Amino acid sequence: MDIEVDIIEFKVPLENNKTIFIWDIQPTFTEAYIYESLWSVYSAFGDLYLLKVCPNATVAEPGFYALVKFYSSAQASKAQRATDKQCLFQSSPLKVRLSTKQNLSFYSSKPLCLSKCHNLANHYLGFGGWTTRIVTLKDLSNCVDAGCQEETGDQGVLLKYGCIMELSFPHHGMSCQGVGVAEEVLDSDQDPEEKLRKRGALMKRAKDKAMEVAFEKVLLLILGNGKVAIEIKIDPDEIVPEENSERVIKVNDISWTHIESADSNAEEDFLWDLTEDLPY
């Protein structure tokens, strides 16, 4: 007999089969009450990436509709089948459908912000199921010999930090590493205390980006019996130096483009564009 396995990745769930719509929500309750009620119902099927409750358009009858995004297509499908035409928290049945809008190819993958990575890992692995450590954290502001010094103008001072983080899963005997970089150009006459604060913020940004990259490599395998296995995606072209290497970040043949573009603050900007067609 085949073992059922659900694969969950640490990326923004954009697929239609991970998104469900709920409508025919009565205006009897407040938006906050509806949110809490829906969260209580649907989080029982699996960890949720997003839940939004919105009032109906003015041309429609008074009431609300909701969007729920799961990390797992299997969990979304199970939730849809179990709750469609059910009253749940109100006196009349709800309509629950999977999204049907065609996805655009360039929205195929987007990494999770670090806070959501933590939530997802804690949900399936527990607070002791994973650990992190800094392999190296380097100041790259003056790495002229590595070819990474940039023109900042007469009034600018470049601050740049690079970090390698290790993500470990002690109960599974597995680990992976991620690389992150953060930079900012400061005014040369800026207050020294402000420069010190910016240095600390840049080091944290580099560390957080490295952690996001490390989580991107992880696959959670949810077995039919509820147990969780771990797999690590290996990129044969990736260059991650050894821990004891000197000048570990100072290389100029690693592309940081995909890291810099993964701005976590913008990850939800396009969510509604992908799921605006409500099936009836």
From Swiss-Prot:
This is RAD52 motif-containing protein 1. May confer resistance to the antitumor agent cisplatin. Binds to DNA and RNA. Residues 18-101 form the RRM domain. It is found in: Nucleus; Cytoplasm; Nucleus, Nucleolus. The keyword Cell cycle does not apply. GO terms for molecular function: DNA binding; RNA binding. The lineage of its organism: Eukaryota, Metazoa, Chordata, Craniata, Vertebrata. The keyword Glycosyltransferase does not apply. PROSITE patterns: RRM. Keywords: Cytoplasm, DNA-binding, Nucleus, RNA-binding. It comes from the Eukaryota. Its main location: nucleus. It comes from Danio rerio (Zebrafish). GO terms for cellular component: cytoplasm; nucleolus. Gene3D superfamilies: 3.30.70.330. InterPro entries: Nucleotide-bd_a/b_plait_sf, RBD_domain_sf, RDM1, RDM1_RRM, RRM_dom. Homodimer.
